[in-house]
Protein backbone atom coordinates (compact mmCIF):
# COMPACT_ATOMS: atom_id res chain seq x y z
CA UNK A 1 0.00 0.00 0.00
CA UNK A 2 1.36 3.47 -0.80
CA UNK A 3 3.10 5.47 1.91
CA UNK A 4 2.12 9.03 1.07
CA UNK A 5 1.47 12.16 3.03
CA UNK A 6 -2.18 13.18 3.07
CA UNK A 7 -3.32 16.14 1.01
CA UNK A 8 -6.52 18.15 0.89
CA UNK A 9 -9.25 16.23 -0.92
CA UNK A 10 -12.75 17.18 -2.05
CA UNK A 11 -15.33 16.30 0.58
CA UNK A 12 -16.37 12.67 0.36
CA UNK A 13 -13.03 11.42 -1.01
CA UNK A 14 -11.28 8.73 1.02
CA UNK A 15 -7.49 8.79 1.25
CA UNK A 16 -7.11 5.82 3.59
CA UNK A 17 -8.96 2.57 2.93
CA UNK A 18 -7.93 0.81 6.15
CA UNK A 19 -6.62 2.41 9.34
CA UNK A 20 -5.49 1.63 12.84
CA UNK A 21 -7.01 4.14 15.26
CA UNK A 22 -4.86 4.32 18.39
CA UNK A 23 -6.79 5.59 21.41
CA UNK A 24 -5.24 6.14 24.81
CA UNK A 25 -7.09 4.78 27.81
CA UNK A 26 -7.37 8.34 29.07
CA UNK A 27 -9.43 9.24 25.99
CA UNK A 28 -12.31 7.27 27.52
CA UNK A 29 -12.20 9.25 30.77
CA UNK A 30 -13.00 12.86 31.55
CA UNK A 31 -9.95 15.12 31.46
CA UNK A 32 -7.79 14.62 34.54
CA UNK A 33 -9.92 11.75 35.84
CA UNK A 34 -9.78 7.97 35.82
CA UNK A 35 -12.34 5.34 34.88
CA UNK A 36 -14.72 5.44 31.91
CA UNK A 37 -17.02 8.34 31.04
CA UNK A 38 -20.19 7.56 29.12
CA UNK A 39 -20.10 11.00 27.52
CA UNK A 40 -16.53 10.51 26.27
CA UNK A 41 -17.35 7.00 25.04
CA UNK A 42 -20.32 8.17 22.98
CA UNK A 43 -18.48 11.19 21.59
CA UNK A 44 -15.67 8.96 20.30
CA UNK A 45 -18.13 6.33 19.07
CA UNK A 46 -20.04 8.91 16.99
CA UNK A 47 -16.83 10.12 15.34
CA UNK A 48 -15.83 6.54 14.57
CA UNK A 49 -19.24 5.88 13.05
CA UNK A 50 -18.93 8.93 10.77
CA UNK A 51 -15.48 7.80 9.62
CA UNK A 52 -16.73 4.26 9.04
CA UNK A 53 -19.70 5.51 7.02
CA UNK A 54 -17.26 7.28 4.70
CA UNK A 55 -16.10 3.82 3.61
CA UNK A 56 -13.01 3.41 5.77
CA UNK A 57 -12.21 0.07 7.43
CA UNK A 58 -11.34 0.80 11.07
CA UNK A 59 -9.39 -1.25 13.60
CA UNK A 60 -9.00 0.30 17.04
CA UNK A 61 -6.16 -0.28 19.50
CA UNK A 62 -6.85 1.25 22.90
CA UNK A 63 -4.71 1.70 25.97
CA UNK A 64 -5.65 1.05 29.58
CA UNK A 65 -4.10 3.98 31.43
CA UNK A 66 -7.45 5.27 32.65
CA UNK A 67 -7.70 2.10 34.74
CA UNK A 68 -4.14 0.91 35.33
CA UNK A 69 -0.77 1.59 33.71
CA UNK A 70 1.47 -1.42 34.26
CA UNK A 71 4.88 0.25 34.46
CA UNK A 72 3.85 2.94 36.95
CA UNK A 73 1.74 0.53 39.01
CA UNK A 74 4.64 -1.83 39.64
CA UNK A 75 6.85 1.10 40.62
CA UNK A 76 4.38 2.15 43.31
CA UNK A 77 3.61 -1.39 44.52
CA UNK A 78 6.77 -3.27 45.40
CA UNK A 79 4.89 -6.52 46.10
CA UNK A 80 3.64 -6.72 42.50
CA UNK A 81 6.19 -7.84 39.94
CA UNK A 82 6.55 -5.64 36.87
CA UNK A 83 5.54 -8.42 34.47
CA UNK A 84 2.38 -9.02 36.50
CA UNK A 85 1.57 -5.31 36.45
CA UNK A 86 1.90 -5.28 32.65
CA UNK A 87 -0.56 -8.18 32.38
CA UNK A 88 -2.94 -6.23 34.62
CA UNK A 89 -2.60 -3.30 32.23
CA UNK A 90 -3.45 -5.59 29.30
CA UNK A 91 -6.62 -6.66 31.08
CA UNK A 92 -7.48 -2.98 31.52
CA UNK A 93 -7.43 -2.62 27.73
CA UNK A 94 -9.93 -5.47 27.50
CA UNK A 95 -12.26 -3.64 29.91
CA UNK A 96 -12.00 -0.48 27.80
CA UNK A 97 -12.61 -2.46 24.62
CA UNK A 98 -15.83 -3.96 25.96
CA UNK A 99 -17.11 -0.52 26.96
CA UNK A 100 -16.24 0.92 23.55
CA UNK A 101 -17.86 -2.05 21.81
CA UNK A 102 -21.16 -1.45 23.57
CA UNK A 103 -21.01 2.27 22.77
CA UNK A 104 -20.43 1.52 19.08
CA UNK A 105 -23.13 -1.16 19.06
CA UNK A 106 -25.61 1.29 20.62
CA UNK A 107 -25.32 3.62 17.61
CA UNK A 108 -25.68 0.89 15.02
CA UNK A 109 -22.17 -0.32 14.19
CA UNK A 110 -21.25 -3.98 13.90
CA UNK A 111 -18.20 -4.69 16.04
CA UNK A 112 -15.87 -7.42 17.20
CA UNK A 113 -13.47 -7.33 20.13
CA UNK A 114 -10.34 -9.38 19.51
CA UNK A 115 -7.79 -10.00 22.24
CA UNK A 116 -4.16 -11.08 22.32
CA UNK A 117 -4.93 -12.61 25.72
CA UNK A 118 -7.32 -15.57 25.96
CA UNK A 119 -10.61 -14.16 27.30
CA UNK A 120 -12.92 -16.18 25.07
CA UNK A 121 -16.09 -15.48 27.06
CA UNK A 122 -15.96 -11.82 26.04
CA UNK A 123 -13.59 -11.52 23.06
CA UNK A 124 -12.33 -13.47 20.08
CA UNK A 125 -8.71 -14.51 19.89
CA UNK A 126 -6.74 -12.23 17.59
CA UNK A 127 -6.12 -14.10 14.35
CA UNK A 128 -4.79 -11.98 11.51
CA UNK A 129 -6.90 -13.46 8.70
CA UNK A 130 -10.05 -13.34 10.80
CA UNK A 131 -9.41 -9.70 11.71
CA UNK A 132 -9.02 -8.77 8.04
CA UNK A 133 -12.18 -10.69 7.18
CA UNK A 134 -14.16 -8.77 9.81
CA UNK A 135 -12.94 -5.50 8.30
CA UNK A 136 -13.87 -6.63 4.80
CA UNK A 137 -17.37 -7.44 6.06
CA UNK A 138 -17.78 -3.89 7.33
CA UNK A 139 -17.22 -4.51 11.02
CA UNK A 140 -15.22 -2.26 13.30
CA UNK A 141 -12.70 -4.34 15.22
CA UNK A 142 -11.29 -3.43 18.62
CA UNK A 143 -7.92 -5.02 19.31
CA UNK A 144 -7.21 -5.44 23.02
CA UNK A 145 -4.59 -7.03 25.23
CA UNK A 146 -1.63 -5.35 23.55
CA UNK A 147 0.33 -8.09 21.81
CA UNK A 148 -0.13 -10.45 24.75
CA UNK A 149 3.37 -9.98 26.18
CA UNK A 150 4.59 -7.78 29.05
CA UNK A 151 7.02 -4.88 28.60
CA UNK A 152 5.35 -3.91 25.31
CA UNK A 153 3.29 -0.73 25.07
CA UNK A 154 -0.02 -0.37 23.29
CA UNK A 155 1.74 2.06 20.92
CA UNK A 156 3.96 -0.82 19.82
CA UNK A 157 0.87 -3.04 19.63
CA UNK A 158 -0.73 -0.49 17.29
CA UNK A 159 2.34 -0.51 15.04
CA UNK A 160 2.48 -4.31 15.07
CA UNK A 161 -1.22 -4.71 14.25
CA UNK A 162 -1.00 -2.06 11.52
CA UNK A 163 1.65 -4.15 9.80
CA UNK A 164 -0.29 -7.39 10.27
CA UNK A 165 -3.59 -6.15 8.86
CA UNK A 166 -1.89 -3.98 6.22
CA UNK A 167 -3.38 -0.71 7.44
CA UNK A 168 -2.57 2.34 5.34
CA UNK A 169 -1.80 4.53 8.34
CA UNK A 170 -1.81 4.69 12.13
CA UNK A 171 -4.10 7.44 13.38
CA UNK A 172 -2.90 8.39 16.84
CA UNK A 173 -5.64 10.30 18.64
CA UNK A 174 -4.49 12.83 21.25
CA UNK A 175 -5.89 15.79 23.18
CA UNK A 176 -3.63 18.29 21.37
CA UNK A 177 -3.48 19.33 17.72
CA UNK A 178 -0.48 17.19 16.77
CA UNK A 179 3.22 16.94 17.60
CA UNK A 180 4.80 20.02 19.17
CA UNK A 181 8.40 21.04 19.81
CA UNK A 182 7.52 21.13 23.51
CA UNK A 183 4.54 20.49 25.77
CA UNK A 184 1.98 23.05 24.51
CA UNK A 185 0.15 22.97 27.84
CA UNK A 186 3.31 24.18 29.61
CA UNK A 187 5.02 26.19 26.88
CA UNK A 188 2.79 28.63 24.96
CA UNK A 189 5.60 29.13 22.42
CA UNK A 190 5.76 25.44 21.46
CA UNK A 191 5.73 24.95 17.68
CA UNK A 192 3.27 22.58 15.99
CA UNK A 193 4.96 20.44 13.34
CA UNK A 194 3.04 19.77 10.13
CA UNK A 195 5.29 16.94 8.93
CA UNK A 196 8.17 14.95 10.42
CA UNK A 197 10.38 12.06 9.43
CA UNK A 198 10.80 9.10 11.78
CA UNK A 199 14.44 10.10 12.39
CA UNK A 200 13.41 13.64 13.32
CA UNK A 201 11.01 12.22 15.91
CA UNK A 202 13.85 10.19 17.43
CA UNK A 203 16.52 12.91 17.22
CA UNK A 204 14.29 15.62 18.68
CA UNK A 205 13.05 13.19 21.37
CA UNK A 206 9.47 14.09 20.56
CA UNK A 207 6.73 12.39 22.54
CA UNK A 208 4.79 10.66 19.80
CA UNK A 209 5.03 6.91 20.37
CA UNK A 210 7.64 4.82 22.15
CA UNK A 211 10.95 4.09 20.41
CA UNK A 212 10.02 0.50 19.51
CA UNK A 213 6.83 1.61 17.77
CA UNK A 214 8.66 4.35 15.85
CA UNK A 215 11.38 1.88 14.83
CA UNK A 216 8.78 -0.57 13.49
CA UNK A 217 7.03 2.15 11.52
CA UNK A 218 10.36 3.43 10.20
CA UNK A 219 11.54 0.00 9.09
CA UNK A 220 8.29 -0.77 7.27
CA UNK A 221 7.46 2.77 6.12
CA UNK A 222 4.17 2.83 7.97
CA UNK A 223 2.99 6.45 8.29
CA UNK A 224 1.55 7.93 11.47
CA UNK A 225 -0.91 10.80 11.74
CA UNK A 226 -1.09 12.45 15.17
CA UNK A 227 -4.21 14.59 15.60
CA UNK A 228 -6.65 16.05 18.10
CA UNK A 229 -9.64 13.72 18.42
CA UNK A 230 -11.37 16.16 20.80
CA UNK A 231 -12.19 18.41 17.85
CA UNK A 232 -15.41 17.01 16.47
CA UNK A 233 -15.07 15.60 12.96
CA UNK A 234 -11.29 15.19 13.04
CA UNK A 235 -11.38 11.40 12.69
CA UNK A 236 -13.35 11.79 9.45
CA UNK A 237 -10.97 14.51 8.27
CA UNK A 238 -8.03 12.24 9.05
CA UNK A 239 -9.30 9.28 7.00
CA UNK A 240 -10.09 11.62 4.10
CA UNK A 241 -6.50 12.85 4.16
CA UNK A 242 -7.36 16.44 4.96
CA UNK A 243 -4.74 18.69 6.56
CA UNK A 244 -5.11 17.81 10.21
CA UNK A 245 -2.49 17.15 12.86
CA UNK A 246 1.11 16.06 12.23
CA UNK A 247 2.06 13.55 9.54
CA UNK A 248 5.08 11.33 10.26
CA UNK A 249 6.58 9.21 7.52
CA UNK A 250 9.42 8.44 5.15
CA UNK A 251 11.55 11.53 4.38
CA UNK A 252 11.15 11.15 0.61
CA UNK A 253 7.39 11.04 0.90
CA UNK A 254 7.39 13.91 3.39
CA UNK A 255 9.33 16.07 0.94
CA UNK A 256 7.56 15.09 -2.27
CA UNK A 257 3.97 14.84 -1.08
CA UNK A 258 3.33 18.17 0.61
CA UNK A 259 -0.16 18.61 2.02
Swiss-Prot record:
Does the record bear Repeat in its keywords? no
Annotated CDD domains:
AAK_UMPK-PyrH-Ec
Query: Which GO BP annotation is one of this protein's?
Result: 'de novo' CTP biosynthetic process
Q: What domain of life is recorded for the organism?
A: Bacteria
Q: Where does UMP bind?
A: 64, 147-154
InterPro entries to which the protein is assigned, alphabetical: AceGlu_kinase-like_sf, Asp/Glu/Uridylate_kinase, Uridylate_kinase, Uridylate_kinase_bac
Any inhibitors or activators noted? Inhibited by UTP.
Q: State the top-level EC class.
A: transferase
Pathway per its UniProt entry is:
Pyrimidine metabolism; CTP biosynthesis via de novo pathway; UDP from UMP (UMPK route): step 1/1
> Where along the chain is ATP bound?
22-25, 65, 69, 174, 180, 183
Assembly description: Homohexamer.
Q: What does this protein do?
A: Catalyzes the reversible phosphorylation of UMP to UDP.
Protein name from the UniProt record: Uridylate kinase
> What gene codes for this chain?
pyrH
Amino acid sequence: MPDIAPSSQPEGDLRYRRVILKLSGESLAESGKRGISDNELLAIAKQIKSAHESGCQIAIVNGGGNILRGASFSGANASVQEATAHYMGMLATVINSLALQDALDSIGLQTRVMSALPVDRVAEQFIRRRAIRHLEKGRVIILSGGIGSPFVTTDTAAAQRALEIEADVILKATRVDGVYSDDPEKNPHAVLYEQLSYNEVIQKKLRVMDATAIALCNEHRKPILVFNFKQDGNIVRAVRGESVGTWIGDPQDTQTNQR
